[in-house]
């Protein structure tokens, strides 16, 4: 995802600078862009690099895996704001990202989101694949949105699977791919009796979420997971969801006979 955003910026004549986390980014792909490597705990080094590159606008992109405290090597810039960093780490993922973002904003930077810098990567409203949801799927979508709305304040997950009005799985730390794999296993074990081709994956940002950070994302792998789970399609919030490689995703959905629905916010 960081590289797709960087490509989008480059195509519009904006030269991005990547600050890549060691152990999290693909070195070969990072090499395509102007970049610097930083480690978790090097907030001071990162801040100096941002200023040396003349970067005022910053965006967090990608999955942030929480390291064990023993793996973090703090520099002086991090130690200086250790209380605020620790407070951010104690919360959920949304709290962590927004907490670090607030620290950077207090240092004079501006945190932006994909909606600000690469709106072309967001899901449009309406159905974008050939297949369309039937009345049962529409009801499942409504149920999924209701469930996610209720769960949002608890920072549990951004996705739920609903089949014939029944909530069969909610996303947790495993992520959406793991959620879909779990549904596939439940179906294989006979725990899901509904026939294949019914049910919906619904994704939405949490109600308490800062939309500059960690927007829900769908792509080809999501479509493959939905097909493997025996569902009918996916529904996400238009303008609040990243559609990674949207054309390839649509083609994959059409091959599998799945719908992709962008819901009004």
Labelled PLM ranges:
Residues 1-2, 9, 94, 110, ...:
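Conserved mixed alpha/beta catalytic, RNA-binding, or beta-rich assembly cores of soluble enzyme
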Residues 3-10, 47, 100-101, 223, ...:
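Short amphipathic alpha-helical segments and helix-helix/interface helices
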Residues 1-21:
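N-terminal basic/disordered segments at the start of proteins
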Residues 43-118:
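N-terminal glycine-rich phosphate/adenylate-binding segment common to multiple enzyme folds
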Residues 1, 64-67, 241:
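Gly/Ser/Thr-rich loops at beta-strand to alpha-helix junctions
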Residues 18-19, 58-61, 111-116, 161-162, ...:
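General beta-strand structural signal in soluble alpha/beta enzymes
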Residues 2-4, 24-25, 100-112, 116-128, ...:
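Catalytic domains of riboflavin
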Residues 21-47, 52-55, 73-81, 85, ...:
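Feature captures the catalytic cores and cofactor-binding loops of soluble hydro-lyases/lyases
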């Amino acid at each position: 995802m960081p590289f797709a955003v960087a490509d989008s910026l480059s195509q519009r004549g904006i030269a991005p600078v990547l600050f890549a986390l060691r152990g999290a980014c693909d070195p070969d792909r990072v090499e395509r862009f102007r970049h610097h490597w930083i480690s978790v705990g090097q907030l001071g080094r990162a801040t100096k690099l941002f200023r040396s590159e003349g970067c005022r606008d910053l965006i967090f992109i990608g999955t942030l895996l929480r390291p064990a405290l023993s793996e973090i090597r703090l520099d002086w810039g991090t130690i200086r704001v250790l209380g605020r960093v620790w407070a951010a780490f104690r919360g959920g993922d949304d709290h962590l990202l927004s907490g670090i973002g607030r620290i950077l904003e207090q240092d004079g930077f501006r945190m932006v989101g994909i909606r600000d810098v690469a709106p072309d990567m967001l899901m449009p409203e309406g159905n974008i694949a050939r297949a369309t949801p039937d009345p049962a799927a529409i009801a499942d979508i409504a149920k999924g949105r209701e469930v996610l709305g209720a769960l949002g304040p608890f920072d549990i997950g951004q996705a739920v699977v609903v089949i014939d009005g029944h909530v069969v799985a909610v996303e947790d730390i495993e992520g959406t791919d793991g959620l879909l794999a779990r549904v596939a296993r439940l179906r294989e074990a006979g725990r899901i009796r509904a026939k294949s081709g019914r049910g919906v994956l619904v994704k939405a940002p949490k109600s308490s979420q800062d939309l500059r950070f960690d927007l829900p994302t769908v792509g080809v792998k999501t479509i493959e997971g939905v097909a493997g789970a025996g569902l009918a399609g996916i529904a996400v919030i238009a303008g609040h969801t990243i559609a990674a490689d949207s054309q390839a995703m649509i083609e994959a959905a059409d091959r599998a006979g799945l719908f992709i629905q962008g819901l009004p916010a």
